[in-house]
Amino acid sequence: MNIYDFDDTIYNGDSGIDFFLYSLKKHKVKIKCILKAIIKYIGKVFGKYEIKDVKDELFDYLKDIKDLDLFVEEFWNKHEKNIKKWYLENQKEDDVLMTASCDIWIYPICKRLNIKHVICTQTDKETKKIIGKNCKGKNKIEIFNKMFPNANVENAYSDSLSDLPMFEISKNAYLVKKDKLIKYEK
């Protein structure tokens, strides 16, 4: 079993930022959402808010999109090309994707790529607000251990040292910089 981060690891860029920018072009994003997100982000810097609070404000406009599933499919029609070739060439059936990105846009691309095991930030279907914790760092591993209690992780891949908990549970770990895989020595 191999475990992968998504953004800047197997996806070239940050899918959340790309999704937001795509939304700005294709859908009316309320300025109010952006301003509230900026305020919450400043509050996060000072320890008043968490990243989930920022995401809740930033993606509040999603509840106004009439056919969100279609909108997400159209987004992936344009952005699927950002999946890195090295991943597609090495993909295995038991891969596990673990990402802080939201299920709203992660599940559809995983379905397209036939990735069956996905751990990501969960959102309420109606309100589009985040349920529980942002899926990052140790939170990823807590969920992973519940889903796969006796897993034997061969390789872990991430672009960030915030994913050290992923590296700690794997035999081999790789830092991903663009298309270059750098063996991480534990």
Q: Model-found features: residue ranges?
A:
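A general boundary/transition motif marking the beginning of the first structured unit of a protein
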Residues: D7, Y11, K26, F46, ...
